[in-house]
UniProtKB/Swiss-Prot annotation:
Highest taxon of source: Archaea
Organism this protein belongs to: Methanocaldococcus jannaschii (strain ATCC 43067 / DSM 2661 / JAL-1 / JCM 10045 / NBRC 100440)
Protein name: Uncharacterized protein MJ0181
């Protein structure tokens, strides 16, 4: 790997995250590096050795994307430098999603499987399409509900509705004959929101990187989407992508 990408595996004792990101030619741009620095910090993924692995995996995906192989369309329009060119191509939004899926697949495989298994719908009040309408990475919530005893279900549903009303959600999901309306995040999730006196609030907080990621997207969506962003990529291909190439 070191020979292919000319990136040393020696880990610095201290480092600037932005400069670390800019070591890679395809991210060697101040604006891109600053936005990716915010992303990695927002999801609390800043260990240099782990970052090195993720960015090297990303570089491999670029090689596949540039090779125009049969399955290259499994990879969205990530930021890259194509063969023989110095001009960057791709979109930051696709890049962030791909980096996130690499992180889940390599370091949080259990959560990756949850994301793949639980297809809760999510739509935010910013009118997001494609990625957001189909799946919720807050699948931890559904896991919590699924594991409760039937006798305890009424209390759990009541607590969940209380939690969601205070978080600003609407709900629409069929559980034990009850309807939960589709999840809509109406505002930022803050630390105080987790202090609601019920057992689900603790388990929601433990969802960790999945909650951090959606909060990051929610708070930075306008900054991530370029004016000409086409968004034709099917979300489910991200699962096929990591399982095929990584």
């Amino acid at each position: 790997m070191e020979k292919i990408f000319n990136i040393s595996f020696s880990m610095p004792k201290s480092y600037e995250l932005k400069d670390f990101i800019k070591q890679y030619d395809f991210f060697n741009d101040d604006k891109i590096a600053e936005k990716l620095e915010r992303f990695f910090k927002a999801i609390n993924f800043t260990n240099p050795r782990h970052l090195k692995k993720v960015l090297n995996k990303y570089a491999i995906l670029i090689e596949f994307k540039n090779s125009k192989i049969d399955n290259e369309r499994l990879i969205p329009e990530i930021i890259r430098i194509e063969n023989g060119e110095r001009k960057r191509k791709g979109y930051l939004f696709d890049t962030v999603f791909v980096l996130y899926f690499i992180i889940l697949y390599e370091f949080y495989y259990g959560k990756y499987l949850e994301v793949k298994r639980y297809k809760c719908r999510l739509q935010t009040n910013t009118g997001l399409q494609s990625y957001f309408e189909r799946y919720s990475l807050l699948s931890q919530i559904m896991k919590v509900i699924k594991n409760r005893n039937a006798n305890d279900m009424d209390r759990v549903i009541t607590n969940l509705m209380l939690l969601y009303s205070q978080l600003g959600y609407r709900y629409n999901y069929e559980i034990k004959g009850r309807k939960f309306y589709k999840l809509v995040i109406n505002r930022e999730i803050r630390d105080k929101d987790y202090n609601i006196a019920n057992e689900l609030s603790i388990e929601l907080k433990e969802a960790g990187i999945t909650v951090d990621f959606w909060e990051y997207i929610k708070n930075n969506y306008e900054d991530l989407i370029e004016e000409n962003y086409p968004n034709p990529y099917p979300f489910t291909n991200l699962f096929k992508m990591v399982e095929t190439y990584l």
